Amino acid sequence: MARVSGIGLVAETRSATGRNRVPLAPAAIVRETFGRCTATKGEPMSQHKYLLNEDQMPTQWYNIVPDLPAPPPPALHPGTLEPAGPDDFAPLFPMDLIMQEVSQDSYVDIPGEVLDIYRIWRPTPLFRARRLEKALDTPAKIFYKYEGVSPAGSHKPNTSVPQAYYNAKAGVRKLTTETGAGQWGSSLAFACAQFGIECEVWQVAASYALKPYRKTMMEVWGATVHPSPSDLTEFGRALLAEDPDHPGSLGIAISEAVAEAAPHEDVRYALGSVLNHVLMHQTIIGEEALLQMQMAGETPDVLVGCTGGGSNFGGLSFPFLREKMAGNMDVTIRCVEPAACPSLTQGEYRYDFGDSAGMTPLMKMHTLGHNFVPDPIHAGGLRYHGMSPLVSHIYELGMLEAESIGQTECFTGAIQFARTEGIVPAPEPTHAIAAAIREANKAKESGEETVILTALCGHGHLDLASYEAFLSGSMVDYDLSDDAIAAAMADVPQIDA
């Protein structure tokens, strides 16, 4: 097997003592990895896409935790405030996933049954956005890794499939979960169908109303779907009593899904972002992208990714961050979040609950407060009060940058992208597209041939109501006041850790 390691590739062999990494000569790089390619640098001027064969798909996930200069803070038990152990997570997750959550191994083998399902759509293509570059009249080179070719139309099956696999292996009858825009819910419904598990989904009410066909997609794959807040849980009923038209939030939907899972021995909960094992599953995106950028003969100067809970961003960026830490490339890596839900750029780095009802372990992360309810922006998958603890920790180490962008600028960029590249993006990655366009315009001003990499983590075929709102002129940007943040932060526990 061959993997990118900075400027070259390494062959990996196994022995009794573990993994051996042997640098390959340039000619061997070509033969081992790219078949009939005759060079490792340069590309035909007309080349738009870079494709890997199925046998070149990575067979391991990458765990960045052991490579960091400092370990991330532990999750805390909500009752004792002591570091949470495996038994504290057992009511929610199977032990295999708990062990991945706390793993100190840099690489985890992908099970064969998971690889077989991955091959339905993986490896995914890397595109050079030549027509967008031309429209922008920029010397920049823009590359995007497209995850919209999966059955659910996004990157989410990269983790829903292994989560369903490990739960099925543990004898779980049903998985519960939350979803915002419906990308995660539909991905888990697809995965559960592959392994014969029931699936019950609480979808944020604002998105449930705005994106009805995602509900239908989930039901096609056998899932049961409820708007959140719902009258099925005590927490949901309390919120509806206060506001019958409550728009919901991902934090609320998580609380309802956890409330259904925790009391039952044969029911577990699946999370679509935030946690370490979820981000680790997504690193197959970045591992493939490293190989494909090598095919293109380019190394990114700037990597941008949309961030809500952090799974898409971590999946693309962590393998590149590994190479940066090893001194093999010098890439600026930037999180891009919605201006209406800016947990990194305006939130505090504090211990907080992952859900709104305070049922989960406390995690140290950038948060706007677990009771924060974002305005109903169209990027429903980014409406989460916190940021992945791992992404937050790496940001605190000074290894990442962050910016926030309003949704009208994002959709302006999405329209330009769709009219040049042909793909209608989901609302979530429009944030990364807008950031890439900003970088391309900077390159135009400076005359520098900046290489930009991003992930188009899903298509927007079921998000056309959002595009209709933009094209009709009814879409607005929301101003998040300091008072709104302060009010939500008032309920965050005060923990000296």
Language-model-detected regions and their locations in the chain:
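Positively charged, low-complexity intrinsically disordered leader regions
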Residues: Q47-V172
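Active-site-proximal loop->helix
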Residues: W184-P247, S343-F353, L464-S472
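Active-site nucleophile and cofactor-binding loops and adjacent substrate-binding regions
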Residues: Y146-T159, L175-W184, L275-V278, V304-G309, ...
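Alpha-helix C-terminal capping segments
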Residues: P162-V172, S186-E198, E219-V220, S317-G327, ...
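Active-site/ligand-binding loops adjacent to catalytic centers
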Residues: Y107-D109, L239-H277, G297, R322-D330, ...
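Short glycine/serine/threonine-rich phosphate/pyrophosphate-binding segments
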Residues: P157-P162, T177-F195, A209-P212, T307-S317, ...
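Claisen-condensing/thiolase-fold acyl-transfer catalytic domains that form or cleave C-C bonds
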Residues: T307-S311, G315, Q407-S472
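A short, small-residue-rich loop immediately preceding and capping a beta-strand
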Residues: T159, A170-A206, T299-F313, I333, ...
